[in-house]
């Protein structure tokens, strides 16, 4: 699919023939004025209908997703978005930070009497030290100040289990760490977390509220929140213990009917599952190849099956930016949006509500992703929040761990083999190679566990090239315990093939490997055949299917997480230190102020294109 730039679109996009289609789909009848580059479906913040008691009322829906506790502007490429230039080429621009997100959202709300703010999950979990050190209490506090109205849960809301998620909702001090601010009890979220497809195994009852109805002056919009059904495959077993995750489509359709029976006909689904547009530019017109043709991935199949009773889908999980239409089961285009990640974008959508039918008019759309640029004034309340928590974290966060010669990209790398992935895998292998530490011969690291880059430019007063504890924690925030297990060569080979088959067939997960472990990935082939037979070697020798190897990996992978059941077959397990501890130990052992760690060559996986 061609990545065709379409910017500053000023023509109205008609979503349905005829003005009477009001029971399905999303959004706006008013023609807004053209906005800045990146505005889509008429773009901008324009609203044209009666803001009072008239029949048609424009409701502003502001949305975002996958914040992951990034209160401060993300560093390096993790803090950038791609956009089209006038000549059709692309450029990267800095974005993100809740001080700026708050300003942008507050400015966007001005002049909009009816405005609701919603999110699609993963707002907490896998967070940088500033939030993660305090079990994400700082992020929930920031979201309260952002006036978030409602969010779905995502998979990362379950990182610390259902009990901790309940604490995020209801408040209270941490059961082991206690209260972080002396004499002040954590109040919890002012907004509801929705988890319609998450039930308790023993009772079958919903873990949290399945839906929420926003209401103002008689205007009512229902929100249904779900996370991906595959959450147990990408969260530790302890995190989802005692829970059942249901089918997204079946769940949304079930509660859409319930809302309809309650007289709520305007419905938005908050879905923590996503897709991938044909271009990584946030202002790409993903409908340019045809409605629904410029985006692929799990969300497209979900959107095609969700009941026409649902008027729009706000999505997440894949950290991608898109504002698309995907045909609903009746063949009518319906809006599907996602706002990248880490607070770098927000989506502004207009929903035109008909007071007589109580439904959303789907004759036209006005929706756009907007960059959370850093050229606006910082929100003072967010600055104070960050300063207060930074002061508490400083004694730990500012400790030097090592030195780097240049940026070492992890999350910001689009390659299968990431330079920072090599460093992490080497750290895990080296830390667990001694006989008394496990005798590891190689290490495997899941790419999703690499949450950021190591950036050479100083983030504070530590000096360029210094890696602080706060920065290493941001890269490895889960503090998973390391495991060393016996794996047969056959199961090791099977695990590599599972990178590109089975649960990972449509969204590959390429394991990062330690030095000495090599193989070839042929992307011209399909499924498991992409891992070339006979190419898998350890220190130049072909892996013997009948032989046993000692393999280091984090406990999540050792449990078969991320779609790697072959890794769960390991035996003779030894539990070592945390992944963060071995990472920091490696940085300390392999770098100094005069001899910083160089960027690895990333030449262990040969890719055939």
Predicted regions and their residues:
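Glycine-rich phosphate/diphosphate-binding loops and the adjacent beta-loop-alpha structural elements
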Residues: 398-417
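Short, solvent-exposed aromatic-acidic interface loops
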Residues: 364-377, 537-540
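Acidic, glycine-rich low-complexity/disordered segments
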Residues: 383-401
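Secretory targeting and sorting signals
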Residues: 1-37
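Feature captures C-terminal
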Residues: 55-60, 64, 70, 80, ...
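Short amphipathic
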Residues: 365-366, 402-404, 484-486
């Amino acid at each position: 699919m061609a990545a065709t730039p379409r910017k500053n679109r000023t023509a109205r996009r008609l979503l349905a023939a005829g003005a009477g289609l009001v029971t399905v789909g999303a959004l706006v009848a008013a023609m807004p004025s053209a906005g800045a580059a990146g505005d889509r479906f008429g773009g901008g913040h324009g609203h044209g209908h009666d803001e009072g008691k008239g029949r048609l009322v424009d409701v502003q829906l502001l949305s975002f997703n996958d914040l992951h506790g990034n209160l401060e502007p993300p560093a390096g490429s993790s803090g950038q978005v791609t956009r089209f230039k006038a000549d059709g080429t692309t450029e990267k621009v800095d974005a993100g930070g809740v001080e700026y997100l708050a300003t942008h959202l507050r400015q966007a709300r001005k002049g909009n009497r009816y405005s609701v703010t919603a999110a699609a999950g993963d707002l907490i979990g896998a967070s940088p030290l500033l939030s993660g050190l305090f079990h994400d209490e700082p992020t929930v506090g920031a979201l309260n100040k952002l006036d978030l109205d409602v969010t779905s849960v995502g998979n990362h809301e379950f990182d610390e289990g259902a009990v901790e998620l309940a604490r995020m909702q209801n408040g209270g001090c941490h059961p082991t760490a206690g209260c972080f601010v002396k004499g002040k009890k954590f109040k919890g979220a002012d907004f509801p977390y929705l988890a319609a497809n998450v039930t308790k195994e023993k009772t079958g009852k919903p873990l949290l509220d399945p839906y929420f109805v926003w209401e103002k002056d008689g205007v009512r919009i229902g929100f249904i929140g779900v996370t991906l059904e595959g959450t147990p495959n990408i969260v530790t077993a302890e995190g989802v213990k005692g829970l059942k995750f249901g089918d997204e489509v079946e769940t949304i359709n079930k509660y859409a009917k319930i809302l309809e029976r309650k007289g709520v006909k305007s419905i938005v689904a908050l879905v923590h599952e996503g897709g991938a547009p044909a271009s990584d530019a946030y202002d790409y017109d993903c409908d340019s190849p045809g409605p629904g043709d410029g985006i692929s991935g799990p969300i497209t199949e979900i959107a095609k099956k969700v009941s026409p009773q649902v008027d729009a889908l706000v999505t997440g999980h894949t950290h991608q930016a898109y504002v698309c239409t995907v045909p609903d089961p009746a063949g009518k285009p319906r809006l599907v949006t996602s706002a990248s990640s880490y607070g770098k974008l927000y989506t502004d959508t207009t929903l035109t509500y008909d007071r007589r039918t109580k439904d959303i008019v789907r004759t036209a759309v006005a929706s756009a992703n907007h960059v959370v640029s850093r050229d606006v004034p910082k929100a003072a309340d967010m600055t104070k929040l960050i300063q207060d928590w930074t002061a508490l974290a400083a004694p730990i966060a500012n400790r030097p761990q090592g030195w780097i010669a240049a940026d070492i990209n992890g999350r910001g790398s689009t390659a299968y083999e990431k330079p920072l992935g090599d460093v992490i895998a080497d750290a895990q292998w080296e830390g667990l190679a001694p006989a008394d530490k496990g005798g590891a011969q190689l290490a495997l690291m899941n790419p999703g566990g690499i949450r950021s880059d190591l950036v050479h430019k100083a983030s504070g007063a530590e000096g360029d090239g210094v890696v602080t504890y706060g920065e290493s924690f941001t890269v490895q925030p889960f503090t998973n315990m390391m495991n060393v297990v016996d794996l047969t060569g056959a199961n090791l080979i099977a695990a590599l093939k599972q990178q590109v088959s089975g649960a990972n067939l449509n969204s590959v997960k390429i394991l990062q490997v330690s030095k000495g472990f090599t193989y070839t990935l042929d992307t011209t082939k399909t499924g498991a055949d992409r891992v070339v037979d006979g190419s898998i070697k350890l220190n130049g020798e072909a892996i013997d299917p009948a032989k046993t190897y000692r393999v280091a990996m984090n406990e999540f992978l050792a449990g078969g997480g991320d779609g790697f059941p072959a890794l769960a077959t390991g035996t003779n397990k030894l539990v070592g230190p945390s992944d963060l501890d071995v990472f920091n130990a490696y940085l300390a052992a392999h770098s100094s102020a005069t001899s910083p760690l160089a960027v690895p060559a990333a030449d262990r996986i040969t890719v055939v294109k």
